[in-house]
Amino acid sequence: RRQRQMCIRDSLIPLFTVASESGDRDIPAEVAQLTDSLKKQFAPDRRVALLDIDYSFSDKNVMLRGVTTSAEAKNVLLKELARKGYTVMDCLELLPDVKGLEGKTCGIINVSVANMRVAPDFSSEMMTQSLMGMPVRVLQRDGWVRIQTPDNYIAWVHRVGVHPVTEEEMVAWNKAEKIVVTAHYGFVYSEPNQTSQTVSDVVAGNRLKWEGSKGAFYKVTYPDGRRGYISKSIAMPEKKWRSGLQQDAAGIIRTAHTMMGIPYLWAGTSSKGVDCSGFMRTILFMHDIIIPRDASQQAYVGEHIDIAADFSNLQPGDLIFFGRKATPERKERVVHVGMYIGGKRFIHSQGDVHISSFDPADELFDEYNLGRLLFATRVLPYINKEEGLNTTETNEYYK
């Protein structure tokens, strides 16, 4: 507690020269090199791991501020700074902030679609979205809540969007029988009829606690305890849904076709709107499959496939990637993804969800994307066999 008070007090008194770890000239070269090394080792992708450090120097005295999700990275940093002769005041916060969260280091998404942002502000760029009933890790609370989703993505969500719970409460939620929303869009009502007051909207993939049935409706409970009724025509019990689930390419492609015309939305991962990788993630999640969030992450799971000139080595359900091809001066860069559906055609979200073709003779020919085609990956055979490819039955967040 004394250390925390000193960190707060000293943050108000400019005794040190403040330097950011992002290359500020006031950081000694040996410290900058150490920081770069630790980031490469412990947080190479800040979408899923954090090591954000601000340094304040006064000769060989240094104050550390910022946050990290890696206890090991913090321990190595402190040890190496001491070895280099620095006297360290440690105000680097290890997430989750267990004390600040009062033990509620878990959470459940409490709105149909929760917008997740770079910073805790409505004007901040949206990074991704999460769906009602989804279990998350709560890392930090500052008016807004910093969470980590089952695909390990880290971002800020408004406090209304997530219901904080303890680990024990999370386990209870995960074990409870649930209703899964199967329609792209719908509502929960305050009474078992569609003329009553709405409680909220819902989208495909939302999960609510199942409390029983009344006529043509399921009685459900929200993560925060609200109650309502949802039509049996747009939802079903999770166990029944899972027993009839098809996780093959044909079934997933049929689901993809049901989203035709849905508008492109940057960072979108719901049937309200999707970006390219969000579309892949959404249609797979409708089949209980969890994959990494972004195209640049999805590109490196499953089996890599160098696409044949006639596309003969592709199979329906393969993910196909587009972007900047490698040159002697620049690395390859993935910026877009779609799903191969056969016959040299693919379905993707670009403007809206639609089908395009690699065949110049096809009326759906897409010359632009053919020109930036990179490679494909085959992910379906590797579900639950490779890190980053799993289901809600095996993902640690759902246990």
Language-model segment annotations:
Residues 1-8:
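Short, small-residue-biased leader/transition segments that mark boundaries at the very start
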Residues 256, 268-287:
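Active-site nucleophilic cysteine motif
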Residues 109-132, 181-210, 264:
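Beta-loop motif signature
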Residues 9-129, 134, 159-165, 237:
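N-terminal targeting leaders
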Residues 138, 210, 321-322:
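A generic structural signal for residues embedded in beta-strands
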Residues 75, 79-101, 121, 149-183, ...:
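Boundary regions of SH3-family modules and the immediately adjacent low-complexity/disordered segments
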Residues 291-355, 361:
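...with weaker cross-activation on analogous glycine-rich loops/strands in unrelated enzymes
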Residues 164-167, 186, 193-196, 236-238, ...:
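Aromatic- and glycine-rich peptidoglycan recognition patches
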